[in-house]
Amino acid sequence: MYPVDLHMHTVASTHAYSTLHDYIVEARQKGIKLFAITDHGPDMADAPHYWHFMNMHVWPRLVDGVGILRGIEANIKNRQGDIDCTGPMLDKIDVIIAGFHEPVFAPQDKAANTEAMIAAMAQGDVHIISHPGNPRYPIDIAAVAAAAARYEVALELNNSSFTHSRKGSEDNCRAIAAAVRDAGGWLALGSDSHIAFSLGGFEHCERIIAEVEFPQERILNVSPRRLLDFLERRGKPAIAELADL
């Protein structure tokens, strides 16, 4: 079991069904020590308003021993790698995931998708690329993994890509994990929960990790401290309330 989950959605994204409080309760029951709420960026039709992200400072950092990170799953908008998390939002958010979503950036050919994904990493604000194995968005896996290692951006293994979403992702996810391993980069695991019961569900990710013999030393979810250290290296301030997790 990994004690950190880095990708989930609340009722603020209206196609999801749980609240922040629901996730805290579930985390306590499952032994999850730290999680990031990553509702969709505002360019998605059912995403929270900009004010949602600007007001996340009202969230407690720690509830009943469970740490809470303020996140976003931003949208990669174009081949230049622009995302819908900019300006003052950047200072309000602890962890920025970014990925392709069809309502914002329609699937392109492999060259264009690769260009956009690498450009998003190069801009310097993105910490994790979400579900890069989506077969609707073919990429040059080796080039993306090399760029991710160079920019210290984690590529995600998304558990829901094996179950409810993005059918046909498994072979790509396996190839991505192997490419990240060979490039010396980071993997991040995300349940991509849209309901609290899925929190911390990484069983399919764990199978891929075992199959490619991915080193645990390069998985961000191994401990809260590893994830927090990663964010601090990437320029985020230390979060005093989470120092003892």
Curated annotation (Swiss-Prot):
GO CC terms of this entry: cytosol
GO molecular function: phosphatase activity; zinc ion binding
Annotated keywords: Hydrolase, Metal-binding, Zinc
Coiled coil: none
Cofactor: Zn(2+)
Transmembrane segments: none
UniProt subunit comment: Homotrimer.
The protein's name: Probable phosphatase Spro_1934
